[in-house]
Amino acid sequence: MRTLALALLVVGSTALFAQTPALPPIKLALVEGLSGGNANGGEAVFRNLVWAVERVNERGGVATPAGARKLALARYDNKGQTEEALSALRAAIDDDAQVILQGNSSSVAAALIDAINKHNERDAAKRVVFLNYSAVDPILTNEKCSPWHFRFDAHADMRMTALMDVLKDDKAVKSIYIIGQDYSFGHAVA
């Protein structure tokens, strides 16, 4: 009887001190141009995100109601093209990504907003959030405003307003010329 009691005590103690299994990571998906003309910008963003994810994970991850969760970052090359970005988004969602990261193209961001809105409406169990770190076309938070899209940068109208506020008081400035790109960002600042 003593042996049985001792064995139960050891087993019970071991169960008490056993670590609970780690919660699954929060999956981040970078959907960015990582090849072609946009490769340098996309790779720079990826390096910065790797650094940030490592820092968060070294500190124990992200606090959630269920407990701390680590971050896991995956990369998807959209080749700077909208259709490729939509394919990459589908692949990221199929891989159970919960957070989509993109920012180096406003036209890609606009397409992602539409696709994410449709996806989240159809599949509430696998909703994703879009974190936009640099696509600055005002349409993204005006006409295409979405509860699933969060922009961390000032949009082009805000930037131009700030620039004009400074320039109007600078008496040394006599003329200003804008050589803008022929796409949404260039049109927004013109």
Q: What are these regions, as identified by a protein language model?
A:
Residues 1-27, 94:
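Short, low-complexity disordered leader/linker segments with a strong preference
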Residues 23, 29-52, 77-82, 105, ...:
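Extracytoplasmic "Venus flytrap"
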Residues 70-78, 129-133:
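Extended hydrophobic secondary-structure segments that form protein cores and membrane-embedded regions
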